[in-house]
């Protein structure tokens, strides 16, 4: 037999990058929730979380497709649907550009 897919450095590095993007977004989400639960404004953190996680979902979906090769593009794999959903997620509750502009206005008086 051959090697397991995770034993290839390019694949394992891609998976590590996927994990880092997800965990970074998760920490932002937890901070926004903590601020809100503390009775403080989480307006900027919520916008940042939406942008970071939406972009992570797109990038992670693209990486998953690349890891799976042509199988990832087949509808049976559901990975192609994940990518379509991820791209659409950039438009729900404000586009990435609008939310980024909002954050820019909040951090640059």
Where do the language-model regions lie?
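Alpha-helical interface subdomain recognition
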Residues: 1-109
């Amino acid at each position: 037999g051959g090697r397991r897919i995770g034993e290839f450095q390019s694949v394992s590095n891609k998976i590590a990058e996927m994990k880092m993007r997800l965990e970074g977004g998760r920490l932002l989400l937890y901070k926004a929730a903590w601020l809100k639960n503390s009775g403080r404004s989480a307006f900027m953190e919520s916008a940042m979380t939406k942008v970071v996680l939406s972009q992570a979902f797109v990038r992670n979906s693209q990486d998953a497709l690349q890891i799976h090769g042509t199988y990832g593009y087949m509808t049976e794999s559901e990975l192609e649907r994940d990518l379509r959903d991820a791209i659409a997620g950039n438009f729900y509750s404000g586009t990435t550009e609008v939310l980024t502009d909002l954050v820019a206005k909040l951090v640059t008086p």
